[in-house]
């Protein structure tokens, strides 16, 4: 007899049902929009092996790998973890924190957005809430990340 699939638990762990029967799109955790070359290689390898070679870049600096079969979910999570890539979340939870490049890279950056995004993510990511909740960190007055479009938006600034 086939195992019963717990769709709610899968969604909580970042696996969203697709219209194709037995297939899921996996949302990955990409904190502050930052990935290492090793992370990108891992995502590409997993996508080639389990996701038809397709990767979707989301509007919130995230990555999704569609076409993952239900029977491959555990091995996909294991292979991603080996490459330092975590799964995201869906539903009424704190989502992965987004951030611009900040003072480490951008000439206009006033704050270290990536460190702040990591700290917020470590503290709040995945917490259950009544509704999905989003943080965004932008490093300066240019507001390239559009901080006000998040539930909590942080903007770097200067005192003159």
Question: What function would you assign to each model-found segment?
Answer:
Residues 1-42:
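N-terminal basic/disordered segments at the start of proteins
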């Amino acid at each position: 007899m086939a195992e019963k699939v717990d769709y709610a638990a899968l969604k909580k762990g970042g696996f969203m049902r697709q219209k194709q029967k037995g297939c899921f799109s996996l949302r990955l955790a990409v904190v502050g929009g930052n990935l290492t070359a090793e992370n990108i290689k891992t995502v590409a390898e997993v996508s080639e092996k389990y996701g038809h070679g397709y990767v979707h870049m989301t509007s919130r600096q995230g990555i999704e790998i569609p076409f993952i079969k239900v029977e491959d979910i555990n091995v996909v999570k294991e292979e991603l973890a080996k490459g330092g890539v975590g799964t995201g979340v869906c539903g009424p939870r704190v989502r992965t924190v987004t951030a611009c490049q900040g003072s480490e890279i951008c000439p206009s950056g006033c704050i270290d957005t990536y460190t702040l995004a990591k700290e917020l993510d470590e503290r709040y990511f995945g917490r259950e809430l009544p509704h999905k909740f989003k943080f965004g960190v932008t490093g300066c007055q240019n507001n390239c990340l559009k901080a006000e479009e998040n539930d909590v938006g942080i903007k770097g600034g200067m005192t003159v």
